[in-house]
Amino acid sequence: MASKEEVAVETVEGGAAAAKAPYWDPPPAPLLDTSELGKWSLYRALIAEFMATLIFLYVSIATVIGYKNQRATVDACTGVGYLGVAWSFGATIFVLVYCTGGVSGGHINPAVTLGLFFGRKLSLVRTVLYVVAQCLGAIAGAGIVKGIMKRPYDALGGGANTVSDGYSAAGALGAEIVGTFILVYTVFSATDPKRTARDSFIPVLVPLPIGFAVFVVHLATIPITGTGINPARSLGAAVLYNQHAAWKDHWIFWVGPVIGAFLAAAYHKLVLRGEAAKALSSFRSTSVTA
């Protein structure tokens, strides 16, 4: 693993020509870095995560309530449909990651934060504080929606994630694991130092695939769970709706994303970045020398 003083060089082939793009491959984040608590940059990042998650919950939950309200009162063909809901979630994440990426990293999701922690990209201190800020922002965002449209909010489920009829808890858990894996895997790939160095002249290439990942996962899992893949989003809606239906299977929307995030981090580091092969090679070399 390169130190901050070392610069790795990647060769990028394009047609007949090859260009070299320098990139930083930062060392693993320390597990406990209490020095962060004395830095304004941490608190600025927490505010950014709080506000971004608040905005995300406001837009996404309002879209879900609006869609259900249209479906219940008028011809379903006049509503936004699953496609519109998925676009709302994906496009909002794209915008918010673009806006906050330079301040906090634009996580807006405890699963993303935990995935980066598992990948040694964040300290435990920053991870815990990010998750708290995201959950508080989600509750505030859902609260704004409920304040604006209280009657349809209460009547139409509050945008809370539930296991749909015809699906088992195990199936819903599997959908959440796979969906979160896709999202966090995309985050790791989009923010990989090699890729960002090569594509740094097109900054939109980082939030764009992340937004599309959210979009396609929603298309696949809205019929199953309403699509969680974000524990803060599920928590915010459940707290404000606060009915048995919202809490009955709420554990799925924490356990699934955490498992999916861990698997994505392991896949990226051990397979795509080749750390498993490097560790095995180092072990063999040590054994031969001994």
UniProtKB/Swiss-Prot annotation:
Q: Which SUPFAM superfamilies match?
A: Aquaporin-like
Q: Where, by residue number, is the motif NPA 2? A: 230-232
The way it spans or sits in the membrane comes to: Multi-pass membrane protein
Task: Return the motif ranges for NPA 1.
Answer: 109-111
Instruction: Identify the tissues in which this protein is expressed.
Output: Expressed in roots.
Entry keyword Membrane: yes
Q: Name one GO molecular function term.
A: water channel activity
TM region positions? 45-65, 79-99, 128-148, 168-188, 202-222, 252-272
* Entry GO CC: plasma membrane
Main function? Aquaporins facilitate the transport of water and small neutral solutes across cell membranes.
Family membership, please give it.
Answer: Belongs to the MIP/aquaporin (TC 1.A.8) family. PIP (TC 1.A.8.11) subfamily.
Record's protein name: Probable aquaporin PIP2-7
Name its species.
Answer: Oryza sativa subsp. japonica
